Amino acid sequence: MATVQQKLITPVSQERSDASRNKVTVVGVGQVGMACAVSILLRELTDEIALVDVLEDKLKGEMMDLLHGSLFLKTPKIMANKDYGITANSRVVVVTAGARQQEGESRLNLVQRNVNIFKFIIPQIVKYSPNCTIIVVSNPVDILTYVTWKISGFPKNRVIGSGCNLDSARFRYLMAEKLGLHPSSCHGWVLGEHGDSSVPVWSGVNVAGVGLQQLNPDIGTAQDKENWKDVHKMVVESAYEVIKLKGYTNWAIGLSVAELTESMVKNLKRVHPVSTMVKGMYGIENEVFLSLPCVLSADGLIDVINQMLKDDEVAQLRKSAETLWNIQKELKDL
């Protein structure tokens, strides 16, 4: 006897199982992973999204919650499983999984614990999606992007870190607040390490092509009477403040990652400050990943924009690189 489906629908052709052209996987369904997933879904960037985690109940719950909202989304396939088989043929894989820093734990110890986690995750991604681009979001992001690059064996254009994309967004927001404008009209770059030693490029800060350093030669320095350097100080401190208030950060980084994903799945060739391998640039001699303005396309990271940095900005970048290398060179089993 025919089912309701058989009575309702007359098949015309066989569905192709490999029809997805822009599948995205998110590894880790914590606060950050889900913010990334929801931001990607709401921006309608993919026809297929896969979620992976070791916590099966949480994973199933998050998937069900999203599926119950399918009517309001335009992503026909939302899947979740602890088996990486469901991630097969992803174009972009977002890695948010990792250990959290415990009270009193050294950064090196945290990184080493994350190395051990990544040694399980990354080979699975490579196995099922050998042509994907990996966006590393887990912290400390610059070091874990290096770790991912080493473990994956991928070319450096297909392993990026979310890096200073968020730092720069925070910088532009705070700059906009000070000027009474929208962040999209305020241009400025934060480069280097995602975190305490990031480098604000005051020489390039502008609105409508008007360089703020031309209007205020002391901008960003200790001599500046308007205290613009506080803008960068707030960028560095903002994550700590949000964590103190709500326990974690997730929405801004989720939106930031969706923006990076869009540039790649739509082949936009937009420029973003993301973490890339900087050996050979600005006099940096070690294999470290730092944020520079990078062009993102369907092939991953295809170009780096050579900014005309001032000597003190280059010195800060090199110092960032040295700090990271001192941790990386101590890592075991890479």
Swiss-Prot record:
Function: Interconverts simultaneously and stereospecifically pyruvate and lactate with concomitant interconversion of NADH and NAD(+).
Record pathway: Fermentation; pyruvate fermentation to lactate; (S)-lactate from pyruvate: step 1/1
Gene Ontology MF term list: L-lactate dehydrogenase activity
Sequence similarity: Belongs to the LDH/MDH superfamily. LDH family.
Pfam families in alphabetical order: Ldh_1_C (PF02866), Ldh_1_N (PF00056)
Chief location bin: cytoplasm
Residues at which NAD(+) binds: 30-58, 100, 139
EC number: 1.1.1.27
Catalyzed chemical reaction(s): (S)-lactate + NAD(+) = pyruvate + NADH + H(+)
Gene3D superfamilies named in the record: Lactate dehydrogenase/glycoside hydrolase, family 4, C-terminal, NAD(P)-binding Rossmann-like Domain
Key words, A-Z: Cytoplasm, NAD, Oxidoreductase
Species of the source: Squalus acanthias
Protein name: L-lactate dehydrogenase B chain
Residue positions binding substrate: R107, N139, R170, T249
Domain of life: Eukaryota
Active site: H194 (proton acceptor)
One CC-aspect GO term: cytoplasm
